[in-house]
Amino acid sequence: MTYKPISWININSKKQIEIHEWPYKKIVHAVAGISNPGNFFSSLRSLGFEVVEHIFPDHYNFSKNDFENLLDLPVIMTEKDAIKCEVLDDHFWYLKIEAQISEGMEQK
């Protein structure tokens, strides 16, 4: 199974934009509190982003203090992490993805 990037969703406003319509520079803070953050960071890099990695433990409970020093660039996180965050500034986004079943798995 692979994951296909679908769109960007603003965490504060819930505004959704197409994956190719990113409105900012392509250097971002990437925040991940998941078990394998490398895949998330690789996905962003494959979309042409320069990534400043911020790794948190899996199932981390974020607070606004965790983001105090992330004001200079847009912040992208996983949908799983975004759901756990309080209202954040408008420069916080998450990457919406869709699972793609590989051809071999479909036939099983």
Feature-to-residue mapping (PLM):
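Short secondary-structure boundary segments
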Residues: T78-K80
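Short conserved micro-motifs at the rims of enzyme active sites and ligand-binding pockets
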Residues: S43, V87, M105-E106
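Short, flexible loop segments at boundaries between secondary-structure elements
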Residues: K4-W8, P57-N61, H91-K108
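Short loop/helix-cap segments at secondary-structure boundaries that form the rim of catalytic
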Residues: I83-H91
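C-terminal accessory "lid"/substrate-recognition subdomains
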Residues: M1-I76
